[in-house]
């Protein structure tokens, strides 16, 4: 592909908000730190050429916070200049292609098609040819032969045929499984034929029984109609009898209620008359009692007003007695004090005592300070001795501590490696355990049987759906019948209660016509009940079938879960085995690193422990030395000694005991004077309080005296009231009784009302007694006998039960016939399916044989081998052309059919492993360029390498840079890298760096 990149512009493409890059011929190095946005440049080139693939999300390329993206790419192919513009804004995308400055394609699909034609490659071939992925060269050097073959096959697209081969294998297996299932089903054909013959015989027998039961049913129906007619006559007689009985009960209840009402009226009248007489006898006593109550209330009200004054007077009297006692005690205390003669000079005496206490306290504090300073001098002498004894150990400790820092760092690295090793070993054990467990769990799962069961359940679901539809229809019919039954019952109830007019047509009706209508509707009702029972029976049978099917269908979820579980576990096993391989490789690498941390046969952690042991031995001396030096540096020894001399001059002749005795004496005198002062103040306050209380008490005396007089009068009036209270209560109860009866009847002139009401009720009682006599006469005329009715009803019920039993037998036989017919139809259909399966088996057998032949063509020994043979000489040719540019002392590079590289040297044939590091890189790069040329079919003019130096050590990076310098056959080589070594070989350097979240580009020619 003779394409040369010339320029790209990016607006809002990932971290490139506004970047423009011109590409020159030669080696172009795009250099920047990881995450700077250098790889995004190639992504923009790829997007410009091939656009958005399937399931592409523009949010992945648009700069965060922006809504649009714009990429413009200029390139040259076969002397023609092309410009592609791709943009996307707010949900709408667009593309344009220009050839030599003129529009060439203006829609996305047209541009995509034109680019494929111009370049001669699609997006996948582009990636496999001119674009060399990150670390691909370094990785190729470390691959095993089988992995190298796989990698080259993938680049050439041969692996797609292997995928077809594998996929067709899966398809063949599916068809083979289908064949096995068909053969399994055909094994049942003979059984179905025998079962069909048996069902036909059973159907013939059932039809004979149905004819017999129909004859029996007709006979019983005639007998039932005769007994039903007689039964209906007695039912009508019972209805009429019960009607009059109910009316008789109603009249008796009404009579009883009226008699009760009469008794209550007579009782209330007597109560009113008696109450009037009692009130007239005791009128004077009642009025006097009410007058006394009013007077007592007034006195009690005044007493409540005076009570607080009365209580205050008593309280103040008590307080006077207490204060007089307190004054006597205070005077007695003052007369006993030793300072009673100096009462006027107490404050002067107190100040002198306080000054003396302060002087003695100062001497006491100086004595304590002197003691502490002498102890401090002793401490200084002690720490001087410690410094001399511990200095040698302190210096040894510092030497060991320096070593400990060095070995501590090594030990941390060593322990980290050990922990990694332990973690990896644990992961290996866990993975092996999990793999074995998964293998054990899947061993007993028969996946083929599960799939067969799931297909059978799908068939049962269809049967269930049909049954449920049938049940819904029957339930609708049930609703219609129940509505009709309710209607008939309502008509019957209305007919039983009717008197004179038909409830349906409102025309006049006699008893005979009424009974005729009742019988007609009862017959209709019985027919509906029979129909209702037949439908309910059919619904119950359907529900049994539904329940049976649901139990089978309920197994589906478990089977699906089991199938999913099996497939998941198989996937897990493959994934875990790959992880196990990686962990074992990591373990080998870590074991090599660990050996570097053993010095003279001893691990660094043990050496560190020895050092720590010695440090612990000297640590106490080290700490003592530091503490002593720190303390001696912090104290002023000379100042302390001067202060001692100063204090000794001041406290001469004093000691602690003398200070204590003098202070106790002075403080006792101080307390005595303060107590005397407090008592004098208290006496003054008490005398003042005494005068105040005496004045307050004299103001309360008049009301106190009034309270005592009223209390005496109240007692006298209450005694008179108590003598009249019984008569008052009797009168009150009589007044209340009359008021209650007035409220009860809501009448003021109650005696007249009650007399009139009694006459009215007596008249109503006579009317009810006459009606009861008429009803008894009608009951005698009906002449209803309950025992005779019961006998006829029993005959009716027995005959009806017999009729129902025969109908049920008939229904059972008819149901059996229907089931047999369905079974026969089902078996015939099944046998027809068997015939179709035999034809399908024949077709499938031929088709599987054909697929297997086609599959072998796509296999490794088929078309894949042909492609490898075709590509090998072509790649070998381009390989030698590229390799010859490096001026290495080899005559020829051979490529085997398995894509193994052999280098022919003067002294023999060498493999890639026999070459030096630089020679290996030259071979790998030459092979990669040769594959690109072979894919495109002509000379590659532009190649892009993404991080080719990743995974290479410093030496190999330098050799790769030198190899790039020698490549002359490729006009344009674009290298994306973060290693600065490649700057020396580049013709153009494009530096990419991040400024915040935005990529900035700078070109150095």
Swiss-Prot record:
ATP binds at residues 14, 35-40, 62-64, 134. Keywords: ATP-binding, Coiled coil, DNA damage, DNA repair, Hydrolase, Metal-binding, Nucleotide-binding, Zinc. Residues 457-554 form the Zinc-hook domain. One of its GO terms (biological process) is double-strand break repair. Its cofactor is Zn(2+). Zn(2+) binds at residues 502, 505. Belongs to the SMC family. RAD50 subfamily. Homodimer. Forms a heterotetramer composed of two Mre11 subunits and two Rad50 subunits. This is DNA double-strand break repair Rad50 ATPase. It comes from Methanocaldococcus jannaschii (strain ATCC 43067 / DSM 2661 / JAL-1 / JCM 10045 / NBRC 100440) (Methanococcus jannaschii).
